[in-house]
């Protein structure tokens, strides 16, 4: 095979690869029920996490939901920011959350919204495990980038 034939073969492979990639539909989650008993509780150094889903929907590039259990006196990570917006619903325990530069203490039933690229943090300041539901959303308007600590 000479250089011209090699180049033509590589170009054809690239075109076919692109066409196949574009033809692969992204599975979009429709209405769904998640049975609590079917969610695996995975222990970690801070407590545990149950992953509910991380998938595209009809209107979101990604919907990520998990439920975390956080041991008393523990923070899952240092204050940080990320492009996606995040909603946290406290089910059990007392936590402090960093919001708009201020640490605020909240308990069961409280709802925390962390805006895109806004510095936020979280720690369990109670004497029992804190359990909370986290909903992260990514849309076409979500800025590019990843998590930045500090």
Tell what function each PLM region has.
Residues 51, 66-81:
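Conserved short histidine dyad/triad with adjacent acidic residue
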Residues 63-66, 82, 111, 132:
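Aromatic/pi-system hotspot detector in well-structured domains
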Residues 69-70, 81-97:
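Short, conserved beta-strand element in jelly-roll/cupin
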Residues 3, 7-62, 143-150:
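A short, N-terminal "cap"/entry segment at the start of jelly-roll beta-barrel domains
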Residues 102-116:
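Short acidic-glycine-tyrosine-enriched beta hairpin
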Residues 60, 116-141:
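Ligand-binding loop in jelly-roll beta-barrel domains
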Residues 75-77, 96, 112, 116-122:
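Histidine-centered metal-chelating micro-motifs
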């Amino acid at each position: 095979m000479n250089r011209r034939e090699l180049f033509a073969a590589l170009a054809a492979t690239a075109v076919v690869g692109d066409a196949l990639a574009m033809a692969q539909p992204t599975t979009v989650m429709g209405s769904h029920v998640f049975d609590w008993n079917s969610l695996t509780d995975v222990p970690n150094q801070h407590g545990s996490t149950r992953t509910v889903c991380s998938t595209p929907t009809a209107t979101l590039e990604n919907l990520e939901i998990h439920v975390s259990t956080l041991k008393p006196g523990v923070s899952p990570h240092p204050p940080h920011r990320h492009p996606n917006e995040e909603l946290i619903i406290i089910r059990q325990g007392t936590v402090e959350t960093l919001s708009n530069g201020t640490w605020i203490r909240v308990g069961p039933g409280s709802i925390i919204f962390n805006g895109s690229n806004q510095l936020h943090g979280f720690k369990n300041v109670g004497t029992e495990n804190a359990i909370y539901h986290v909903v992260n959303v990514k849309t076409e308007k979500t800025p590019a980038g990843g998590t930045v600590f500090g």
